[in-house]
Every structure is written in structure tokens, then in C-alpha cells.
Amino acid sequence: AYMWDVAKQDDPIASMLESLQTTLERFRVRFDSWVRQSSFEAALSDAIAALETYEQDGAVWVRTSPHGDDKDRVIVRSAEKGGKPAYVAWDAAYLRDKVERGFDRLIYVLGADHHGYVGRLKGLAGALGFDPERVEILIYQLVQLLEHGEATKMSKRQGDTVFLDELLDAIGVDAARWYLANRGPDQPIEIDVDLAAERSAKNPVFYVQYAHARIAGVLRNAGDAAVSAEPPAELAPEERELIKRLADFPGVVAEATERRGPHAIPIYAIKVADDFHRFYHEHRVLESEAQAFRLALVRATQLVIACALNLVGVEAPERM
């Protein structure tokens, strides 16, 4: 029904783009720019001219196989097939545009059905005279939804799909962002809709947010009480483990950035919440001999949790 409604419009592209932007804004995602493929049409001839090509079977081929591709690619179709540039030509024009805009890392984010593009894009980079190692390709897997313990069957061909807005309606923006960021690009993403909507410790995003809110409550009750980073003569094991975990945060963020692995952040946040809850269960913060230091410790924990949640676009509530 959705596609039928769109097809009946005079300018379906504008309508679809507006719908996408509205959904993404709700999902806390903002693109700096939107570029239509047609904007590269004028650059096609220059891109093709920059490549080593040859004619075969009435088509124009580009030599990408010497640069790591598994075969050469048709870049201009034969007259029998319309004689127009193939999609490889658009890829070449876009790749050149990335380089001309001054970027040294050319990152592509593709879907699970685009594994064949890895060799193709790297081969194109080499054929254009660029180092293929500058091309980074992240292949993200499909999202599987579970409802009442059963997988939701989805098929684009049959029109059986779940739109992002429907997922946000069911579990909220925070949970959706958490679960979509919680897996690496090479791992299938499975979202248990029932669990993601729960307000319990079994739901990891709730569990981490609750740790933040719990600390906020402690700090509110502390009022203007003194805070000191000076540790007591002897640290409890739970204090020591929590401090060590907090000290890991800069390294976790740096590694997540370098490896294009944001999933490391929520995984780390769960460990921080685990360590905090363990510490809080075993030790009083207020009205304890180490109150000033423990207030500093829980405040540091709150800051790290808030920063981790912010990095994956999840809110850090003060109350729950």
C-alpha cells in the first residue's frame, strides 16, 4: 500500500526523501548532505576516460582485475542493452569525487547482499590510480525481529517488511538505537521486541540507564556534601574493579573508532553498570567512612555511563 501511494504521486522522490528525513530525525540521525546520483552524470565521461578500458562484445570494459577485482567490469553497456554507462561508471565518478574533496579514507557502508562490491570498489580505486587500501567497506548484516519468541518473516520481494517507524513505536528510540549499535557489522542483528520494551534488568539498555539514574539519585541525596578523589588507605575489591573499568574507557573509545566498531561502546557500558551495581550492593555511599571518595567514584561512573550512552545516541535519564 505504501509503494502504491508513492507511485501515484507527481514527484515521488521528494515525498520519499521527506519521509526518510522525518524518520531519521526521530531516530536522532542527521546527514550533512543528500546527493542524488544524477548529480554525477556530468562527471561520468571524465571518470571513464581516467580508466584503462577496452571493447568486447559491443560493450566497454574497465580493467579492474589487475587491481584485485575477481574480473573486469562492463562500464558502458552494448548498444543492444541500451549503450548507457553501467553502474560501475557511477561508482567510479563517486569514488573520484570522494578523493577530489580531500578525503584520505573512503568509507562505504553497504548491505549484506553487496559482498561482491568489495573487490569491485577496491579494483576501481586501483584502476583510477588510488591506493585500494584507502577504500574501507563495511558490510552490515540484516536485522531479525523476534516477537513472542518467534522470528518475524520479512521479504522485500513479497512486500513483507517492518519500517523503522514501526520499530520505534514498539520499543522506543533509545532501545532501537542501542540494539542496532550493539552488534558489529559482520554480525546478524537480532532484536527481541518484547525484551527491548521491558523495563527490567533483563533489558540491557534499561539496565545501563538505570545505573545512571540510580547514581543521579545518590548525588541528589548527597546535596552539597564534600567530594574527594583521594582514595582511602585500603580500597574494597569492588571499588578497585570499578576504578579499573572506568580507566579503560578512553582506550575502548579509541579502539572502537579505529576499528569502525561502535558496538564496543554498549558492550563496555554494560560492564560498567555491572561493576557499579556490584559495588553499590556491597557498600554504602552516603553516611560511610569513605563517603567523600565514594561520591567522587560514583560521579565519575555516572559521567562515563552518560558519555558512553551519548556516543551511541541514547539518553541518560536522571530519574526512572
Where are each of the predicted segments found?
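Non-catalytic interaction-recognition regions
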Residues: 1-320
